[in-house]
């Protein structure tokens, strides 16, 4: 199978699944009291509101949306802790889905 072209179609790209995997990698860091801060605590609140539009003024958020919206913050965290597998997945998501 050829490499999917995000500018033509998202066929063959599982952005939602990749974003959920990335959030799981992110949670390993931000759920650690020594690595979290006010920003990440607020981010976790956003994660708790996924697929709850009644709590987000009618706007349905998902993991992929949050990854895209906070990609630079997420990248900085992974770079800080030299999390190479997470950075590789983040690069893939950025290339395929952003």
UniProtKB/Swiss-Prot annotation:
Keywords: Nitrogen fixation
Annotated source species: Trichlorobacter lovleyi (strain ATCC BAA-1151 / DSM 17278 / SZ) (Geobacter lovleyi)
Biological-process GO terms, alphabetical: nitrogen fixation
Lineage: Bacteria, Pseudomonadati, Thermodesulfobacteriota, Desulfuromonadia, Geobacterales
KW Membrane (keyword) present: no
Name of the protein in its database record: N(2)-fixation sustaining protein CowN
Family of this protein: Belongs to the CowN family.
Purpose: Is required to sustain N(2)-dependent growth in the presence of low levels of carbon monoxide (CO). Probably acts by protecting the N(2) fixation ability of the nitrogenase complex, which is inactivated in the presence of CO.
Family matches, as InterPro entries: CowN
One Pfam family cited in the UniProt record for this chain: CowN
